[in-house]
Amino acid sequence: MKKMMYTIPVILTCLFATSTAIAAAKPNILVLWGDDIGVWNTSAYNRGGMGYKTPNIDSIADEGALFTDMYAQQSCTAGRAAFILGQQPFRTGLLTIGMPGSDQGIPDWAPTIGDLLKEQGYATGQFGKNHLGDQDKHLPTNHGFDEFFGNLYHLNAEEEPETYYYPKDPAFHKEFGPRGVIHSYADGKIEDTGPLSRKRMETVDSEFGGAAKKFMAAAVNADKPFFVWMNFTRMHVWTRLQEKYRGITGIGLYPDGMVELDDMVGS
């Protein structure tokens, strides 16, 4: 995994609802998080120098701020842990990427942003890639989130069972294979919605985005402020694009995927 400064640009936007006094006092918070995306891969920074544009992402920069200095963690798990826990990963042990079957994950004693915002009356949801633990005890819904719908690892780990070299022994897969896409709730309900196959990778970000929008709408209807952490799987290898985006830029898979991601941000 590349260093975090090349892995995840964080797009943070506060959406202010005006329907109630509580929403006016407490802003809705939506964090949009990409994967394996360098600062120079958005046209807000490269000014079109990479041969494609990301107008929806750029609009957030235009209405907010562009960061010119940054400190980054060395891996996906470490960076996500630093953000959601507010601690240096060496304190929590979340320094390397978590793999299927590992006991590594968010420790019980470490509060998350979700924990703190729930105390302030927020509805808390996490959608998309998590990578902060494989076991039920590590799921976001056991660490301050009302709802989680997402995958637990990087994409190349998800598609390993489809490769020719992956062990075919069912016992091996049960012990060490990746879990499917998980949908869980704070009341303890956990549903495995099936594997994140190569085919599902093409549209899974749309699944996650749809669930996130549904969650936000429900919070607004309930007159509750929300905190949503939306984690796209783009652009981690291996990236499987929707057919309509393949070749859309004419300059390669990565640019095509950035256009797809930008459209999802705009939706």
What positions do the PLM features span?
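Bacterial N-terminal signal peptides
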Residues: T7-T18
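Formylglycine-dependent sulfatase
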Residues: K2, Y6, T20-S267
